Amino acid sequence: MELNNVANIGEYAFSGCSGLKSLSILKANNVDASTFNGCDAIETLVLPYEWGVDFKMTLSGTTQLRTLYIGENTASIPDKTFVNNKNLFEVYSNVTTPPSIGTATFGSETYSYATLYVPQGSVDAYKAATGWSKFEDIQELPFQIVVKDKKVSVDRTKSILVSASVTPASSTSSPVKWYSLNDEIATTTTDGVVTGMAEGGVTILAYCDGITAPMKVIVKKFDGVEDVMADDPTELSEFDVYNLQGIRVRTNCTKEQLSELSHGIYILVSPQGRKKVII
């Protein structure tokens, strides 16, 4: 179950879902201890980007947990959090600097038999860190996500297209998806159309198979008059069409098919760039 766009998950929301085997809660910042109570069949878990004080999910009952992904902005994990997860044999950490953990955060079976995957260039740091050094097998992540720009800016109410790639490209067939950590500042579609909503800064995440890479988005006040094209909409042969809410309304659209759209303002996106048009 992918809940990567959900920030707050209510009490007992999924309590007793004994058939739930995969869970991804990348954006969650408020999870009660009761939210996933009784979900003891979970085998794969993608933790939130940041393990904050409001993340109170009880993990001791997830005895079938085999694969764990740790969020990139995690500073610490409480001791004995995974001590009862005796089947946990794959741990993926997105954190370059090892989070603070205790010597019993994980169980002895995990320390002895699991593989710990860490970001490129971080193996030695994990081998020297308290708790992490108990892992007998520490390797680099099988791939990394490379974002085209670490920091971008967009005017409020306007949109830009961001991109990222996986290297090595052959390591996964899954697409890179995008998520905003604060939709009040900027929203993003999963394929990277970012729309400014209010002035400020926000982190958006490129995500693929539990691995993440951040991008900083600065939303600026738009002071000028918006230039909306009303003549020749595009020089491109095909493009995806989005409305101003960032929702994709047409894929592989040709110039001739634009006339089929309802009247309004749209964003035309292709690998070569983007244009805003009025229909």
Task: Provide a role label for each language-model segment.
Residues 175-176, 184, 205-208, 216-279:
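C-terminal outer-membrane/trafficking sorting elements
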Residues 10-13, 33-35, 57-59, 79-81, ...:
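Consensus positions within tandem repeat domains that build extended binding/scaffold surfaces
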Residues 36, 105-106, 161-166:
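Core beta-strand segments of extracellular beta-sandwich domains
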Residues 1-8, 18-30, 40-53, 57, ...:
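Structural signature of tandem-repeat unit edges
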